[in-house]
């Protein structure tokens, strides 16, 4: 019985640690996004700024092995 209580207690502690680590990671990511948004673009051409914003809006590229093996004959 005591062993079961100890296991439950340790499990709860691990869960709390995991959730707090996730929250801290999300907070750091939010800060990074805010810092990127605060970039000063004065003196840069509008076309370059437009391309930067379009690139940042795209989802990250993923490697798809199915398309890699296809031949374009």
From Swiss-Prot:
Tissues expressed in: Expressed by the venom gland.
A GO cellular component annotation in the UniProt record: extracellular region
Subcellular location: Secreted
Signal peptide boundaries: 1-25
GO biological process: regulation of blood pressure
Keywords: Hypotensive agent, Secreted, Signal
Stated role: May potentiate the hypotensive effect of bradykinin.
Protein name: Hypotensin-like peptide
Gene source species: Tityus serrulatus
